[in-house]
Amino acid sequence: MKKNVLMFAAFLIVSLAAFAQGQKRFNLYAVGFYNQENLFDTCHDEGKNDYEYLPAKGWNGMKYTNKLRNMAKALADMGTDKLPKVGCAFIGLSEVENHKVLDDLIEQAPLKARNMKYCHIEGPDRRGIDCAFLYNPSLFSVKNVKLVPYVQEKAKDSAYYTRGFLTVRGEMAGEDVAVIVCHWPSRFSGPFYRESG
């Protein structure tokens, strides 16, 4: 996963450098992606199959708080090897349950210190997991956010809904930037859904 993040960061750096070449100006921005691995709160969301992450199944407030603390530290550390004071300009997130977990996440000290904000649109996934976009508003300004549904070409089950693609348009370093945050269907979904994604 680190290799993918580094490759994406390198691509963004090269892209921004190419735009700036005419002016001989180069800016370095770290960006990333992090799978939150089922960041669920401890409350049931109506209409969602989130029962595995409720107190009856052993998921409790202490585990949730520890996960928030650990995730916030990991996210805040991303990009600090090159940009120790600012870290990532933005980070795509997957497997977040709802606005509440994102509110709780950005209230954690390491992210709150950077005034991190987020974009999230509730999707149709049966389990309730979505993608989100975490960003530093002093480095990236959001212009437009949209959820594009994931459509299977030959889906056998028309009732099968999964997370879509969160698209974010914004501005960074005076340039228009478009980001797509996605989390492809997992092995649990079977080969048809993975391969058609």
Where are the regions a protein language model picked out?
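N-terminal, active-site-proximal structural segment of metallo-dependent hydrolase catalytic domains
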Residues: A20-A109, A113-N115, C119-I129
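Short loop/turn segments at secondary-structure transitions that flank enzyme active sites
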Residues: E37-F40, F140, P185-F188
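Bacterial Sec-dependent N-terminal signal peptides
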Residues: M1-K24
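Generic structural motif
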Residues: N4, Q36-L39, P137, A173
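Short regulatory "switch" loops immediately downstream of catalytic or recognition motifs
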Residues: A74-D81, Y150-Q152, F188-S189
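Active-site His/acidic residue clusters
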Residues: H44-D50, E175, V181-G197
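Structured beta-strand-rich core segments of catalytic domains in phosphoester-bond hydrolases
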Residues: V96-P185
